[in-house]
Structure formats: structure tokens, C-alpha cells
Amino acid sequence: MSVRRRLAFVLLAWSAAAPAARAAGQPATATLSATISPQASLTLSTASLVFPDADPDVLNKVPATGGPVTINAKARATQGQAVVLTVLASSDLRSGLDVIPASNVTWTASGAGFVAGTLSATVPAQVATWTGSGLHSGSQQYFFRNVWTHPTGTYTTTLVYTLSAP
């Protein structure tokens, strides 16, 4: 191979390889974006509470059968913001035309952030509160105030739990 041909071959090979070599060393950037919105998830261990009949002289606070309601709350919230769990009775307890105020139902609580309270049909009662995102578990043991003056009947209402994470 002549010197000219060799030189032409080397120059051609070098010119073809040079852009690839320079491109391999060029930095590039990409933007990664993840949107994390406030979100909440709530699970209860039971969908019904039952208070058995009892003699008011023997038991003036009747515990719900089945033991405490276990509550699992998951929330994503803005850092430093409160996450609040409340419960509200849809109405007072009713049996036909007879009514027993929801305030005859109370609860004790266990678990970080959980508090004892009294049921209401007008104002949501606080069950628990936390700060920021997280997973929280606790329980409520419900009690019914058992007195001689309650009219007989089977009384019902619906409990509406609300978990809010701003």
C-alpha cells in the first residue's frame, strides 16, 4: 500500500472515529419528576357494633361484643400538617319513633395519637390525630350507657369515619 493510500486510509478512519469518541464524552441531562399527592386509606376490623342487653343495676356501661375495633390509617400529607380521624353518627340511635341520643355511646382508645371520646350526631368527634405522613394503628372500645329509662327496642345508627390528610 502506498504512503498516500495509507495516509488517506488513516485520515478517513480517524475522521470517522473522532465524532464517536467526542460523543461518548459529552454529558447529557434528563429531568425526573414524581408527583406525590395527599392521600388517605382507612380500614376497620369490623363493619358492625353490637351491644347486648344487660341489667342496668349490674352493668351501666355495656361494651360492644367482639372487643375493640382495630383501626389502620395510612396517610400522605404535607410535611408538618395534621392528619385527622373523626367519627360522626349519621343520626341519633333510633328504634321506630323512639330515639336515644348518640352521646350515650362512648369509647376508650389505645395507640399513639388515639383519644377517648363521645359519639355525636351533629359534630364529628376526634378519634385520632397525627402530624405528617405515616402508617398508624390503634383501637376503640365502644360502650353503651345502659339506664332504666331507655325505651325498649333495637336501636341503630351508622358511624361515618373520615380520615383527612391536607
Predicted regions and their residues:
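Bacterial N-terminal signal peptides
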Residues: 8-17
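N-terminal small/polar-rich segments of proteins
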Residues: 22-166
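Bacterial N-terminal signal peptides that target proteins for export
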Residues: 1-8
